[in-house]
Amino acid sequence: MRYKNVLFDLDGTLTDPAEGITNALMHAQRRLGREVSPREELFVFIGPPLIETFMSEWGLTRAEADQALVYYREHFGTKGLFENVPYAGIGDCLAQLKAAGLRLYVATSKPEPLSLRILEHFDLLKYFEAVAGSTMDEQRTKKGEVIAYALDTYALDPSETVMVGDRKHDVIGARENGLDCIGVLYGYGSREELTAAGAAALAADLGELSALLKS
């Protein structure tokens, strides 16, 4: 196999978090006194760091975005994190990859404590060597920063490590750290988005992903 270590994104790659994230965003909009958006318009928030997306999508200042995050977490931290569904077959896929000798990690822009709770709740934590996420104080949120932290903390060789994710932020963050990235097409990023960002390969489903990782 070309790779020894695999860094998995969480949202849109291991689980589909749309219901919980969008419900939390709607809660934040109500608390901010904003009009509540149609659910589909909020899918753009799935994947990238929230603060920068609040600013770019809602036109908030940094201070307003910080407050929006507080309101978002009121819902997400209690209910939203479990309004979430693992992709069908993901457990079997991870078990097979682990059995093949690959070392699996999670690298996510979601706060690390919340990520651990989600993975444990859905019985997925057992497949991973470790979980690298963002910090609750927003000091480490960009995907490149999270990947750099994972590589350094777990002493992973970039030439033996690959990122797997569904958005351009996964690809860009991987490339910033000298990693290939395999883009998955069952999440929230399009073929065009992932290709333009420079994905090394694309997988339409878990079967294709498993084959690419084991090749």
Regions found by a protein language model. Name each.
Residues 1-44, 58-59:
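Active-site neighborhood of HAD-like aspartate-dependent phosphohydrolases
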Residues 5, 142-171:
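Conserved Lys-Pro-Asp/Glu-containing loop-to-beta segment of HAD-superfamily phosphomonoesterases
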Residues 25, 90-119:
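Substrate-recognition element of Asp-dependent hydrolases with the DxDx(T/V) motif
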Residues 28-29, 49-62, 118-121, 150-151:
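Helix-loop "lid/cap" segments that line or gate small-molecule binding pockets
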Residues 35, 61, 125-129, 157, ...:
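Conserved H-loop
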Residues 55-92:
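Metal-dependent phosphoesterase signature
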Residues 125-139:
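A short, structured active-site edge motif that brings together acidic residues
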Residues 162-203:
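Acidic, Mg2+-coordinating phosphoryl-transfer loop and its flanking beta/alpha structural elements
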